[in-house]
């Protein structure tokens, strides 16, 4: 499941650069679904750092701050999962 999430992060980054808002919304929904499945499979990852990353991810997405969203995905979530 980690590979699915990491692939989805790459897909979202590509969409951010293409500025396709519909595709971004769809890809973000898939990412969230994949993260829920990952948490179910790997209970240990539910810790303070992961929760903080999710808050940052939600904040960036809600504000539609694509630069911040890309930063959280590339420099916080991706390294955490690798």
Predicted regions: what they are:
Residues 1-82:
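C-terminal-biased regions
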């Amino acid at each position: 499941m980690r590979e699915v999430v990491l692939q989805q992060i790459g897909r979202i980054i590509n969409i951010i650069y293409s500025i396709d808002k519909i595709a971004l919304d769809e890809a973000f929904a898939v990412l969230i679904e994949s993260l829920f499945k990952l948490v179910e499979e790997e209970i240990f990852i539910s810790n303070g750092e992961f929760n903080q990353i999710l808050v940052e991810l939600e904040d960036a997405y809600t504000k539609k701050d694509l630069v911040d969203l890309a930063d959280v995905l590339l420099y916080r979530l991706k390294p955490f999962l690798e």
